[in-house]
């Protein structure tokens, strides 16, 4: 699914939460059929937009093309109660989060 704005082409890809947290490389099909090898760094947040220059539509009367912009959507897993328990235990033991929900003032 592609959208066009001027000479830029936009698309969205689903990336699972583990790949957003840990980083990954994903192949993305461009509208012209080329495969774009997209490196998603660890800690990428959902809705991050990656810009691939010169992979959009040709710019009239120029020797250049627009950009191909790829937005990441977070694909959440369906977790069982056991999965949730294991994730909570891992988060507490590994101390990957340096904050606690109880300390947030709203």
Enumerate the predicted regions with their spans.
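Intrinsically disordered, low-complexity linker/assembly segments
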Residues: 1-106
């Amino acid at each position: 699914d592609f959208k066009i704005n001027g000479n830029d082409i936009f698309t969205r890809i689903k990336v699972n939460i583990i790949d957003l947290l840990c980083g990954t490389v994903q192949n993305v099909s461009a509208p012209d059929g080329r495969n774009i090898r997209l490196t998603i760094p660890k800690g990428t947040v959902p809705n991050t937009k990656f810009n691939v220059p010169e992979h959009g539509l040709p710019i009239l009367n120029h020797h250049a093309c627009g950009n191909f912009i790829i937005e990441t959507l977070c694909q959440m897993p369906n977790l069982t109660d056991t999965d949730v328990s294991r994730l909570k235990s891992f988060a507490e033991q590994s101390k990957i989060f340096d904050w606690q929900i109880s300390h947030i003032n709203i």
